[in-house]
Amino acid sequence: PARGGGWSARGRAAARSLVSGHGPLADLGLWALSAALMTVICARFINAPDAFSQTYDTIFHLNAVRWILDTGSASSLSFDMVTARGAIYPLGWHTLVTLTMRLSGAASIPLVTNAVMFAVAGLVWTSGVIALTGALTADRRAGRVATAVLASAAPAFPLLGLFWGILYPMFLATALLPGILL
């Protein structure tokens, strides 16, 4: 093999990227750190993968997913499980859980709800916060490193919707905010 060409050159470039703290591999490492921290935090308040929260509103949200599965309608305009006709209730979270259930073939609503919760906290929130910080700090390394840790240290965002009552729609909306602000 030729020196300095092919996979060896790419491998060295990737290693330099990781060590120097610049480039896509370094960003992937920061994201993985932040996602892991968020996952640990979320895992601390569920007893088992298919357990559901014993706080306010949980049964409503689990039943809303069941209602969508049973009726086939995920429209906020026609959701009348407990609301009066003509009332609008945000079903983005419930639709996401239902879609995940249908695509995965899983049958347990609590299990899929927890899986989506982990995905939103670990993937959506951390990706959005790190990307927004990169945009606001002109990709300065110190800003991205601090954000990777602090994204999981802020107790109110987005986790307040999970710890106080179960406010899944607010949790999803809060997790989406950094990406929307880009």
Predicted segment positions?
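Active-site lumenal/periplasmic loops and adjacent helix-entry segments of GT-C-fold
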Residues: 37-175
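Start-transfer (signal-anchor) and selected internal transmembrane alpha helices
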Residues: 1-45
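Membrane-interface transmembrane helices that cradle and orient dolichyl/undecaprenyl
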Residues: 177-182
